[in-house]
Structures are given as structure tokens and as C-alpha cells.
Amino acid sequence: MKTVVFAYHDMGCLGIEALLAAGYEISAIFTHTDNPGEKAFYGSVAHLAAERGIPVYAPDNVNHPLWVERIAQLSPEVIFSFYYRHLICDEILQLAPAGAFNLHGSLLPKYRGRAPLNWVLVNGETETGVTLHRMVKRADAGAIVAQLRVAIAPDDIAITLHHKLCHATRQLLEQTLPAIKHGNILEIAQRENEATCFGRRTPDDSFLEWHKPASVLHNMVRAVADPWPGAFSYVGNQKFTVWSSRVHPHASKAQPGSVISIAPLLIACGDGALEIVTGQAGDGITMQGSQLAQTLGLVQGSRLNSQPACTARRRTRVLILGVNGFIGNHLTERLLREDHYEVYGLDIGSDAISRFLNHPHFHFVEGDISIHSEWIEYHVKKCDVVLPLVAIATPIEYTRNPLRVFELDFEENLRIIRYCVKYRKRIIFPSTSEVYGMCSDKYFDEDHSNLIVGPVNKPRWIYSVSKQLLDRVIWAYGEKEGLQFTLFRPFNWMGPRLDNLNAARIGSSRAITQLILNLVEGSPIKLIDGGKQKRCFTDIRDGIEALYRIIENAGNRCDGEIINIGNPENEASIEELGEMLLASFEKHPLRHHFPPFAGFRVVESSSYYGKGYQDVEHRKPSIRNAHRCLDWEPKIDMQETIDETLDFFLRTVDLTDKPS
């Protein structure tokens, strides 16, 4: 049976050997070049392929059409993936009549994603395993073909558990590969409600936070012990690594991080104490705990810290350009609620952020991004995270002022992106659901949906393509120059402070604000082309919580990701939105101050937006990336959002001239 194999690591070598032993004909092997910054303790797939006389390749992007075509020419009957680190596109998976199968190092559906070996130890699990499953578009989500359980002993560390998983893999493949070859397998669908997903880990994720229980810190040490980079802490500015440890149920009133004793080297934790059995100071040699204490100059009562002393208390500096806007002011409120952020903001007005102007950790300058370029460059260099939220994002402006949309939304933001590249700063960039354009997918997917727009003579698309091109530029900078980025795509966020009624009076606002103005002034609610277009409306609080988690970036899971932020359950047409808003308006305690409802009026889009407008019939997000990267899902019902948004705007109206 002819196969093409994607493989890396020890598991890749085991998979190749098992396939050959089972009589498979391997036409080609795809692997990775070794990362010089990674300690290579595992077998080389490339060396094994060369020794066995099998063609081997390590392309940067195996999903490129040229590679898809070359793989198609090999006519594989079945495809296997053993610890290959990149997702394989559906075009390749569909090439094999018998299907494609992946080996994953956990008991799926638990611990989907990256580094399951380390994560199960971090989380103190007592059991894991290996799973062979059918490959589908979504990572690690296909039907299970075979599983083998592996017990995790209390003294297991990452390398011993790795060896156990290798042994289990050998057994699993010996039992299963002949059955696949003869088409005699039983597949069991994964239970999505039991699925968990974890992102990649980096060495920086393994710092020891002494306020946590000793058992949690011990599990961290086990999870990243040699040959992994190791768990670490600091004495002042001196970094040291803990290679092995023990938990002591030591009852102590000492502050977490305090040295309780030198021999053995015991450190007070949030619960219990951790004995450092072996460790290493800086880039030195490994030594036992009491010698490490001497090397570090520790005495009883010394304090350890999770970060270098000079930076331990510095707040994360967040630069928000467009801080007075809808997203900017709500995000500022969320960040200042915590005690570890310093917010720097620029905007042309300050009405929405006036409540923060006296906050000690909020720094605001009134200005225009097209003029204050030196201020912006200085603060990009100064800050840790940059959010360029300035954009023209109201549909009527796309046809009314297309060049201004391009100049602000594309040209000005490109300059900021290049500052982030220059100073190696993390950028969180607001893409838009508009980039999907007229995509026909039921759910718009960040990684697979096509981005489809209308012809050039429809200037309505200038906003969409400006944002899309910036998405592609940012992605390219990430791939080629190491820019740390996350793209987020809001789907019709709404809530208090979305535009204002004055903007709505000139047509320069989003849908709900325009509808509220119609109710306030007693003018007909205009339904563009009948108002049948469907959108998924998202409460600003849900959206901001997701954005806050992107900024937090737990485990660096958001790096290099595109994340839709929307509520697929809150789908409604513009007509339905208007009806819900009207019902809420009629029940509001301030209703008697406003004129009678003037009814709905159907108007053509060309008469409202002008020549060159096209609309989109539906726009529903897939939020699988938000689940995976943020552990987030929206919670707030659309009716609650409508009620609160309406209430906010009605209470901003001057009622002195209104009838009572």
C-alpha cells in the first residue's frame, strides 16, 4: 500500500519503522529542518529516510500548490502524520483514497493541540496515552481509530513519560497498521463536549510563581526537566534553573518565595514547601540543592522572585491608538481594572475616556495619527503591546470618501506596523469581519474561508481590501522578520458608546446607533434593501473580554493567530434588529419623552449609500480559534445588549425640549 508520510521527532522515526515492518511502500517523507535553538535529544527522521533510501523533503510550506501537485503525482493510497508540526491542508488529505491518519500524544479528545506531553505533567494528570485518528480540517478532531493508555507515575518527568509514550506508540502501530492496510478498522467519533485544547509552550512559560502550591510548582519542574529548558526563578537578577524537586508538606508562616532552609534547600510556597533537589545557576553546571544555595548566596530568610528584580513590578505598557473609540475606551476600562497595566492613548477627542483622565496609570494625548508620527514612534518603542484601533469603519464612508478610507485605514496603519517591526514590539491588529466579503461558507473560518469581494467599480470594498492587505502584510512580517502579532476580527460588536447620535445624523454610524436616532427623532427606520441581511451581533463586554485575553496571551497561544470574535448564536437580520429595538424602546421608562414611532421604510442601498455599494447577505463566524487560543465563548444574549445600548443613548439625549 503506497503512502506518503509526514514525520518528525522520535515518534516520526517509530512511525516510519512500523510502516515498513507492516509492508507499506513509503513514496516520500516530509519532515522539518532542526531548529538550532532547540536541544535535539530525539531521532532524526531525515537521517532514517536517507539510510532507508526514501526521498525526504523539508519545505517551508508543504501546503503550497506546487507541493500539493508533487504529492498528487505520487498517488498515495493512504497518508500518515507522526508528530509533524504543521497543519496539513485539506487538498493534501483528500489525495489518499483510504484517508489520512495522525498520531497524537494524548487520549483524545483531551489535550488537543501542542505539547500534550508537557501539559499533562503541568496539570498533574495521572494518565495519558497515544491516539491514532483520522485527519480532518480541524486539528486533532477526527474520528479515533485506536488508543492506548499510559499511566503517569508520581516520579515521571517529561523524558521518562516520553519513553513510555514511545513504547505505547510502537505497540499501537503494530496492532493497527495491518488493519488500516486491509480496510478493517472501527472508527469512533470524538466527543466534542469533552475536548480540551492547549497551545504551544515556550521556555518563558516555565517560571516558578511561588504563591502557587508546592505541588503545582513540582509538576512544572517535572514537565520541563532536562532535556527541556527547565523551570526557573530568580535571586535578584540572577536566574537559576530547577532540574528536580520534591514536595514538602511544610507548615510555615514564611512568605511564598522565602528560603526556609539551606540543607535541604526548601522554599516556602502558597501551600507547603518545595525542596530544590538539583539545579543550575545561570549557564553553569548542575549541582545539588545546598550547593546551589551557596552559589546563589542564599541564607535562611532570603527571598526568591519569578522575574528579575529590576522588572518584577513593572506594569505591561499598552499603546492604544484610537483610545477614545468604541473598542478603545471599553478596552481601557478593562485594562485599568487590573493592577498590572499602564495604558498610553492617542485620539482626536476624549469624550468617551474622560472618566479615565485622572487615573494614575492612564496617559492620554489628544492628537491625530497622521500628524503625531514622532510621538507614535516614540511610544511604540516605549510600550510592550500596540493596538492601532484608528480606522474609518462606517459603510457610508466607503462610498462617500474611499480615498480617505484608504489613506487612514491602510497607509497610516502600515507605518505603525513597520514601527512594530523596527522595534520588535507585539502588535494586536484589528482586522474585520468585512474581509470575508461575499464568502458563501456557512461559518466564516479564519484559516480556510476564501476572502471574496466585488469588482473594482464598487468602492464599498475599499475598507475590506485595505484591512485584508494589512492582514497579509502583518502575516508576512511575522513569517519573514519575526513580528509578534495577533489579528482579531470583530463581528458586529455593539453596546454603549458605539458611535454617537451626532454621527448618526450625518449617516456616519453603525446600524443600531442609526436606528436609535430614528426612534429618538421620530423618523422612519430605513431598511436598506428590505433589511433582510443577517449579522451576528456581539456584546461589547464579550468582545472586550476576548481581546483582553489576547493581550494576556497565556502560554503565547495567540502568537501568529487570526481570531474571530463574534457570537454565532446572536444572528438576526437588520429588520429583526429594528423590531427588537422598537419593542425595547416602547417599554423604556423614558419613552414618553420621544415622538411616536414613524414606521419602517424600505429603501434601495444606492439611494442611501450612493453609487458603488454592495451588501452581504450573511456573516456568521466560526469561533474555534477563540475557543482554542482564549478558552473563550460569548455569553450575553442579544436582547440584553439592545436594552443596555438603547438605555445608554436615551439617557444622553437632552430632554428639556422633549414632550413629557
From Swiss-Prot:
Protein name from the UniProt record: Bifunctional polymyxin resistance protein ArnA
Region (Dehydrogenase ArnADH), start-end ranges: 314-660
Active site: H104 (proton donor), E434 (proton acceptor), R619 (proton donor)
Site, as annotated: Transition state stabilizer: N102
Cellular component terms (Gene Ontology): membrane
Family of this protein: In the N-terminal section; belongs to the Fmt family. UDP-L-Ara4N formyltransferase subfamily. In the C-terminal section; belongs to the NAD(P)-dependent epimerase/dehydratase family. UDP-glucuronic acid decarboxylase subfamily.
Record-annotated site: Raises pKa of active site His: D140
Gene Ontology biological process: lipid A biosynthetic process; lipopolysaccharide biosynthetic process; response to antibiotic
PANTHER family from the UniProt entry: BIFUNCTIONAL POLYMYXIN RESISTANCE PROTEIN ARNA, UDP-D-APIOSE_UDP-D-XYLOSE SYNTHASE 2
Coiled coil: none
Binding site for (6R)-10-formyltetrahydrofolate: H86, L87, I88, R114, V136, K137, R138, A139, D140
